[in-house]
């Protein structure tokens, strides 16, 4: 399940499919459909919408449908990690672990929260580190949303420059986000060869 930030994953793989073609093509349905590679927008909501816990039961209801053939489940945050407490994240991790134990044939993908510009001392980073440590220690599968937004495609690191989810960052250390690493990278690389045009909610 996802809302707007999680939609970046779907629009991204859809654009890769259009840009590169086979073997990156895939089948898609908006809702549940057996035999389809990606069932999008089902279950509805995200990890904090309408609350921080009901997504787990919606996952059970989804997987318990007759004929269900899903072997991967991935839930996305929107902005809820930014104001999450340690207890909130413990709840998330515990619910994920319970689902893994109940459905051993399904791979559950954990996720960090997207960047919010608060830097390495902000609550978001602390909570993301909590998720990362749990996944590392437990051998979990993690889609590290924040980490992806922290590096450009050449591996240049922006995490210490207060980057946000739009790829804006503080270029000169004055506390103002005055540059955008995604636009800079695109402008120095060739469209259609190094990168492709793709809509991305909230981002470049």
Model regions: which residues?
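Extracellular/periplasmic catalytic domains that process cell-envelope and extracellular macromolecules
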Residues: 18, 65-69, 101-103, 135-137
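Oxyanion-hole/transition-state-stabilizing segment in secreted/luminal serine hydrolases
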Residues: 52-89, 116
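Substrate-gating cap/lid alpha-helix
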Residues: 113-154
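Structural recognition of the beta-strand scaffold that forms the well-ordered cores
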Residues: 1, 6, 24-31, 37-43, ...
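Stable alpha-helical elements in mature extracytoplasmic
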Residues: 5, 9-12, 73, 88-95, ...
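Histidine-centered active-site loop/cap adjacent to the catalytic His
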Residues: 165-204
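Charged, often glycine-rich, active-site loop that binds/positions anionic groups
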Residues: 34-57, 157-163
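Well-ordered, non-membrane alpha-helical segments in soluble/globular domains
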Residues: 51-59, 85-97, 122-131
């Amino acid at each position: 399940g996802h809302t707007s930030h999680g939609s970046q994953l779907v629009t991204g793989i859809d654009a890769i499919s259009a840009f590169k073609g086979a073997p990156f093509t895939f089948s898609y349905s908006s809702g549940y459909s057996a035999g389809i590679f990606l069932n999008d927008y089902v279950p509805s909501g995200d990890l904090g919408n309408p609350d921080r816990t009901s997504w787990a039961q919606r996952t059970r209801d989804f997987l318990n449908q007759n004929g269900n053939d899903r072997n991967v489940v991935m839930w996305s945050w929107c902005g809820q990690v930014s104001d999450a407490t340690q207890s909130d994240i413990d709840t998330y991790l515990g619910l994920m672990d319970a689902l893994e134990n109940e459905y051993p044939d399904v791979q559950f993908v954990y996720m960090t929260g997207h960047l919010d510009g608060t830097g390495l001392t902000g609550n978001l980073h602390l909570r993301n580190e909590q998720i990362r440590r749990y996944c590392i220690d437990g051998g979990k599968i993690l889609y590290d949303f924040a980490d992806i937004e922290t590096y450009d495609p050449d591996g240049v690191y922006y995490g210490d420059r207060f980057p946000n989810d739009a790829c804006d960052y503080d270029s000169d250390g004055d506390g103002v986000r005055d540059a955008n690493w995604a636009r800079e990278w695109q402008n120095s690389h060739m469209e259609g060869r190094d990168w492709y045009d793709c809509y991305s909610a909230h981002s470049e």
